[in-house]
Design a protein with these regions (language model features):
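Short helix/loop capping segments that flank catalytic or ligand/cofactor-binding pockets
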Residues: 46-47, 147, 156-157, 212-214, ...
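Helix-loop-helix
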Residues: 59-101, 217, 221-245
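Short acidic-glycine loop/turn motifs at beta-strand connectors
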Residues: 29-32, 139-142, 150, 157-161, ...
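PP2C/PPM family metal-dependent serine/threonine protein phosphatase catalytic domain
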Residues: 5-19, 107-127, 131-132, 156-197, ...
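Short hydrophobic beta-strand that contains or immediately precedes a catalytic carboxylate
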Residues: 36-40, 147-149, 203-205
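Catalytic core of PPM/PP2C metal-dependent serine/threonine phosphatase domains
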Residues: 74-155, 189-196
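C-terminal catalytic subdomain
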Residues: 176-273
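N-terminal entry segment of metal-dependent catalytic domains or homologous docking segments
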Residues: 1-67, 152, 184-186, 191-193, ...
Length: 273
């Protein structure tokens, strides 16, 4: 069996500025699959609807992953499956953005703070207003499908150790991150398929959760291991409260999002070390 949940909490910097939470997360479960998402709307001034962009990204990836059939793994190669998923996810997200823009175009109030140069760029590409990262994972039988664009991550968990499911992005200009809203998003949306039988679980999170720990080793020991123990003990309320505290007090002021899907009944000896 699989135990799973996601949690998003607003960061204290957004509380101070009276800004809404720009992260979004969701989980979906049925008899065949479990899906978790963690999306981070960009904080730059041009991304005036990033809180919606992150929601659309989460909805898009859940919708597309729900359509994957077990027979697809026999009909197509893993490369073909990944390429098809990549295209479908981006098309779904862009369709949601276009529909929202058609129903409610950018208002003067939303763009009042922008310089003429940034306003011009936004008018040329209004989908930039919805800029967001996307991290998601689906347990599907004995397969694990991982999806990521931008910072944050999808993290594999096995016997108390963790590893990135997808490689880190190369350094970008001015420390920016790749985004669902960029024209070449297809080139940067990464998808990988693993055999889940070799793993204990999978984690998705935004950078607001990872960054306060400064290293993956510290993140593993101070966050992942204790969380895995708590979720096996059914202490989700404690996990929920801790993630809220990271956003409001402990972290760097950014919104924080965390999701986990983990096998039940596994040996926890290595998580207690």
């Amino acid at each position: 069996m699989i135990t799973y949940f996601t949690k998003t909490s607003i960061g204290y910097s957004h509380i101070k500025k009276n800004k809404c939470c720009q992260d979004y997360s969701a989980c979906y479960h049925d008899e065949e699959r479990t899906i978790i998402t963690a999306c981070d709307g960009h904080g730059g001034d041009i991304y005036v609807r990033s809180h919606l962009g992150s929601k659309f990204a989460s909805n898009a990836v859940v919708s597309v992953l729900q359509e994957l059939e077990r027979s697809d793994f026999y009909k197509y190669s893993r490369t073909d499956i990944c390429n098809k998923l990549r295209l479908k996810i981006l098309c779904e997200w862009n369709a949601m953005v276009e529909k929202h823009l058609a129903e409610k175009y950018l208002s003067k109030r939303e763009v009042l703070h922008l310089s003429e140069d940034r306003l011009f760029k936004l008018k040329q590409n209004p989908e930039k207003a919805y800029g967001t990262t996307l991290n998601a994972a689906m347990i599907f039988g004995n397969k694990l499908v991982c999806v990521s664009i931008g910072d944050g991550g999808v993290i594999l968990v096995r016997k108390g150790e963790i590893a990135l499911a997808l490689p880190d992005d190369e350094e970008t200009v001015a420390n920016t991150t790749y985004s669902m809203c960029q024209e070449d998003a297809y080139e940067h949306l990464k998808i990988e398929i693993y055999d889940f039988s070799d793993l204990d679980g999978v984690v998705v999170c935004t950078d607001g959760l990872i960054n306060p720990y400064q290293s993956m080793g510290n993140f593993r020991d101070k966050f992942i291991k204790p969380i895995c123990l708590k979720i096996q003990d059914g202490k989700q309320i404690e996990i929920d409260e801790f993630i809220v505290s990271v956003g409001e007090k402990i972290g760097i002021g950014d919104d924080v999002t965390f999701g986990i899907a983990m096998k039940t009944g596994i040996s926890l000896r290595s998580y207690r070390k």
